[in-house]
């Protein structure tokens, strides 16, 4: 029935236009792809920070868990924003307007540059938690970026050790203290211009990552 009657494309159908089925790429080269990847990372960090703020307001996370997570996100935000900052994007406000990113809680955290749990006093527990998280990430990021000279690593590592000592809630036998202490001893035997070799960098990253995870487990306990 109805044999020989050609099929007629519906209204708006592509018909015989194969180009309409081709994949549309946002980028033309590797540099453009990296640019869009960097913007996507920044977008994701801001959205995650907004979700974390809402979770804290709803009492879904403890103050210590929130402080650690927010501190890490603030460090990630700074790194992500540096990758997109330029002639097209000069500020985070401009980025949010351009991509219709409505995250007022995250923007407040970014502008204050600290978790909401942190007060101005230096002895505040949450301030110590935030500093420990930030220093762990800072040292590990330096190593990943092949910054390995003794005088570039030791100051942050020493500050990390001192900050952990100020946390009276942290057990005296906390494994992270032992890890940091051992690496400080290693660095103290080096001259300022000496650099860690590849094997030492790999081991130090592994040790610090383990210590950082142990610190997070302590906060969640």
Swiss-Prot record:
Entry-linked Gene3D superfamilies: 1.20.120.1130, 1.20.1440.200
Subcellular localization: Cell membrane; Late endosome membrane
SUPFAM superfamilies: Endosomal sorting complex assembly domain, VPS28 C-terminal domain-like
Highest taxon above the source species: Eukaryota
InterPro entries found in the cross-reference section: ESCRT_assembly_dom, Vps28, VPS28_C, VPS28_C_sf, VPS28_N, VPS28_N_sf
Entry GO MF terms: protein-containing complex binding; ubiquitin binding
Residue ranges constituting the VPS28 N-terminal domain according to the UniProt record: 13-120
Entries under PANTHER family matching the protein: VACUOLAR PROTEIN SORTING 28, ISOFORM 2 VPS28, VACUOLAR PROTEIN SORTING-ASSOCIATED PROTEIN 28 HOMOLOG
Similarity comment: Belongs to the VPS28 family.
Protein name per the record: Vacuolar protein sorting-associated protein 28 homolog
Annotated gene: VPS28
């Amino acid at each position: 029935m109805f044999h020989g009657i050609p099929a007629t494309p519906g209204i708006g159908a592509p018909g015989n236009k194969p180009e309409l089925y081709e994949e549309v790429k946002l980028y033309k080269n590797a540099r453009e792809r990296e640019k869009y990847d960097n913007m996507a990372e920044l977008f994701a960090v801001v959205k995650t920070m907004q979700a974390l703020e809402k979770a804290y307001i709803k009492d879904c996370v403890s103050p210590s868990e929130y402080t650690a997570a927010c501190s890490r996100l603030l460090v990630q935000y700074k790194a992500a924003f540096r990758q997109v900052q330029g002639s097209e994007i000069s500020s985070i406000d401009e980025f949010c307007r351009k991509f219709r990113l409505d995250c007022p809680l995250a923007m407040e955290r970014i502008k204050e540059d600290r978790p909401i749990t942190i007060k101005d006093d230096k002895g505040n527990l949450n301030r110590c938690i935030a500093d420990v998280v930030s220093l762990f990430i800072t040292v590990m990021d330096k190593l990943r970026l092949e910054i390995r000279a003794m005088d570039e690593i030791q100051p942050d590592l020493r500050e990390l050790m001192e900050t952990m000592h100020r946390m009276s809630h942290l057990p005296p036998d906390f494994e992270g203290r032992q890890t940091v202490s051992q690496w400080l001893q290693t660095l103290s035997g080096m001259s300022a211009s000496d650099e860690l070799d590849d094997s030492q960098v790999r081991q130090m990253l592994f040790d610090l990552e383990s210590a950082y995870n142990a610190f997070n487990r302590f906060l969640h306990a």
